[in-house]
Amino acid sequence: MEYVAIDFQTANRWHKSACSVALVTVKDGKIIDTFYSLIRPGILHFDKENTALHGITKEMVKDAPYFDELWPLIKEKINGKTLVAHYARFDMDVLEEELTGNKLAFPSCPVFCTCVLSQAMFPEMPQHRLQDVTEKIGFNLEQRYNAMAQARACVAIVEYALKATGAEFLQDVADAYHFHLGYIGKDVVTECNFIILIEGVRLVMRILMLLLLCKSPRLITIWIT
């Protein structure tokens, strides 16, 4: 079983401002490849709040490759593999914005969110930030906002869950904790989310429909059956 942990850092509040990326490829529980690069954003503007977190400045990326220059290598490493990220919605938004903005072809990848996994594994925890989860499982996250450190932390969380459940595949872990994997592909990006939440929305919709039809019992009977 092979997957790739991925993490982006951004230069500013806009998702299309990736300034670093890290990939950690894992096969059968062992790291077989790592990749890290700074990225020069299309608009070379860094919010001071972002720099305060990850320490990357515009001077550091002025000679770095643009995202579209890196993409062929990144795509080769991730295409067809499950992507793992903490709060994957952010990283997939960054990836989607960069691909769309640069008119690049999307990969085809299932998406596994370790934040959703943590919420399922440790419901008693008040927060599920990466540093909280790694502390819970006994993994030392040395640099909280370094892309490579965060990607390695995601690997640690996944391997912890695989061992805890006795699962062989990430889909088995998702099934054990009752959530769906997300997906990124051509013209579609779906989030990793709890099955119970999805079913809950459907139940609420059915109840609302019943309330709307409550003045006509005959319609309710027809609709239910």
Give residue ranges: language-model regions.
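Generic alpha-helical structural context detector
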Residues: 116-119, 135, 156-159
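Active-site flanking residues adjacent to catalytic metal/cofactor-binding acidic residues
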Residues: 6, 112, 149
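Short, glycine/acidic-enriched loop or turn micro-motifs at the edges of active sites
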Residues: 10-12, 116, 153
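Conserved beta-strand -> loop -> alpha-helix junction used to position metal-binding or nucleic-acid-contacting
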Residues: 105-118
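Acidic, divalent-metal-coordinating active-site segment for phosphoryl/phosphodiester hydrolysis
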Residues: 146-160
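Conserved non-catalytic scaffold segment of RNase H-like nuclease domains
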Residues: 1-108, 123-145
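Acidic two-metal-ion nuclease catalytic site recognized across multiple nuclease folds
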Residues: 158-224
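Residue-level recognition of specific faces of alpha-helices
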Residues: 114, 133, 172-175
